[in-house]
Amino acid sequence: MQVKEILRVKGNRLISAEPSDRAVDAVKTMAEQNLGSLVVLDQGRMAGMLTFHELLGALAKRSGTLGDLKLSEIMVHDPVMATPDMEVNDLRRTMLDTGARYLPVMQDGKLLGVISFRDVAKAVLEEQDFENKMLKGYIKNWPA
């Protein structure tokens, strides 16, 4: 299974922010949309990623307040990325090795979507369930 198959099932809904946006507004958007990450776009081009991890770190450093902190100050400027043709096993390994919970999927400089660790786990589980059903059907119909 490849990343593009997960994106196809997941859909291409993408919520973004700008580097000049306030972190407190990003928190509101993420809470309202039930998101763990936001893609940060600067004039339509990917500038970085913001996840709850960066927000929690900023809160810890600033005694629980974000004030007028801008996303450009806390976002990951050069996030680890995936490609649509990447195999899911390679994607899982990349996520585990880097600790990234969310990876932007890029092709030829174009952002196609974001894959979360949950998306990967769900896709792998569904693939395994399908294979199990097929094997059980095969075994059940095995000639005696």
Predicted regions and their residues:
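The conserved cystathionine-beta-synthase
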Residues: 16-34, 41, 81-99, 106
